[in-house]
């Protein structure tokens, strides 16, 4: 049986292998109970970020309803290493549990890694860089990109595009990890020639560009290099956007600022009465 094809169909296919007896010699698909101190953190966990608020909510749910889905663990000396379910394990400790339901499977490193990645992908728990690093870990285990795609049930292009994120400059990776730019922004940076990627990243941050504007930076850079005139128009930087919001709140109408060093301020009104109200707010009194 191909482990990769089984994993590609999901965890259920792996955990209920056809013809496999249930729970022999303390391992298998039978749910058992282990003391929580005998359960160890995963050697490789694709998910790097566990939000404290989310863990606290899960801990409260566990206090009220218990752990509804057992952890998957594998023997490691006198302990058992988590393969799938680390978030439940962390939350159970917060909830004060002393025992946890588990399924014990004798798994090799690569198979354990594949299962951990598939579980997180099925739950949509991984950030873009966590997903890319997880694929890279499978490559490091000896799989090629096609093998990784089969193992996790994704298209090869999905795996390839995710791995490309790892080629970004370190400041971009750090910003993506911190959430200060989106994966779509990062992919827009990837469309730039390698020498221009840091420049594009700084433009996105300093000018507050949206994804569409970030994608257009390649044309802007090309136009400047070839002397083809002024750069494309983009939205005002973040400071202007904040000013738009402040003026909109003050006047009670939509305000739009275009341009940077030079430009215009537009105020919208829907009636003569609304115009009079805006003029009064601005301190202008029309002559009778």
Swiss-Prot record:
<dbReference type="Pfam" id="PF17762">
    <property type="entry name" value="HTH_ParB"/>
</dbReference>
<dbReference type="InterPro" id="IPR057240">
    <property type="entry name" value="ParB_dimer_C"/>
</dbReference>
<keyword id="KW-0159">Chromosome partition</keyword>
<dbReference type="GO" id="GO:0007059">
    <property type="term" value="P:chromosome segregation"/>
</dbReference>
<dbReference type="Pfam" id="PF02195">
    <property type="entry name" value="ParBc"/>
</dbReference>
<dbReference type="Pfam" id="PF23552">
    <property type="entry name" value="ParB_dimer"/>
</dbReference>
<dbReference type="InterPro" id="IPR004437">
    <property type="entry name" value="ParB/RepB/Spo0J"/>
</dbReference>
<comment type="function">
    <text>Involved in chromosome partition. Localize to both poles of the predivisional cell following completion of DNA replication. Binds to the DNA origin of replication.</text>
</comment>
<comment type="similarity">
    <text>Belongs to the ParB family.</text>
</comment>
<dbReference type="InterPro" id="IPR041468">
    <property type="entry name" value="HTH_ParB/Spo0J"/>
</dbReference>
<protein>
    <recommendedName>
        <fullName>Probable chromosome 1-partitioning protein ParB</fullName>
    </recommendedName>
</protein>
<dbReference type="GO" id="GO:0003677">
    <property type="term" value="F:DNA binding"/>
</dbReference>
<dbReference type="InterPro" id="IPR003115">
    <property type="entry name" value="ParB/Sulfiredoxin_dom"/>
</dbReference>
<dbReference type="InterPro" id="IPR050336">
    <property type="entry name" value="Chromosome_partition/occlusion"/>
</dbReference>
<dbReference type="GO" id="GO:0005694">
    <property type="term" value="C:chromosome"/>
</dbReference>
<dbReference type="GO" id="GO:0045881">
    <property type="term" value="P:positive regulation of sporulation resulting in formation of a cellular spore"/>
</dbReference>
<dbReference type="InterPro" id="IPR036086">
    <property type="entry name" value="ParB/Sulfiredoxin_sf"/>
</dbReference>
<keyword id="KW-0238">DNA-binding</keyword>
């Amino acid at each position: 049986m191909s482990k990769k094809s089984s994993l590609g169909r999901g965890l259920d296919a792996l955990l209920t292998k056809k013809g496999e007896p249930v729970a022999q010699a303390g391992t298998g698909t039978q749910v058992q109970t282990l003391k929580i101190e005998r359960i160890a953190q995963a050697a490789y966990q694709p998910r790097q970020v566990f939000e404290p608020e989310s863990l606290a909510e899960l801990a409260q749910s566990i206090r009220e309803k218990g752990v509804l889905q057992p952890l998957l663990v594998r023997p490691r000396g006198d302990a058992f290493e988590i393969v799938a379910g680390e978030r439940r394990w962390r939350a159970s400790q917060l909830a004060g549990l002393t025992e946890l339901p588990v399924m014990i499977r004798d798994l090799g490193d690569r198979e354990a890694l594949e299962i951990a990645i598939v579980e997180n992908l099925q739950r949509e728990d991984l950030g873009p860089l966590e997903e890319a690093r997880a694929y890279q870990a499978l490559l490091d285990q000896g799989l090629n990109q096609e093998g990784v795609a089969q193992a996790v049930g994704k298209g090869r292009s999905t795996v390839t595009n995710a791995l490309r994120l790892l080629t970004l400059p370190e400041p971009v990776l750090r910003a993506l990890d911190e959430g200060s730019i989106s994966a779509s922004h990062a992919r827009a940076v990837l469309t730039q020639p390698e020498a221009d990627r840091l420049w594009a990243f700084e433009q996105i941050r300093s000018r507050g560009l949206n994804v569409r504007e970030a994608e257009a930076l390649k044309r802007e850079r090309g136009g400047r290099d070839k002397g083809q005139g002024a750069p494309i128009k983009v939205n005002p930087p973040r400071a202007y956007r904040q000013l738009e919001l402040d003026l909109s709140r003050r006047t009670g109408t939509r305000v739009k600022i275009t341009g940077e060093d030079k430009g215009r301020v537009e105020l919208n009104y829907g009636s003569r009465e609304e115009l009079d109200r805006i003029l009064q707010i601005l301190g202008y009194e029309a002559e009778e």
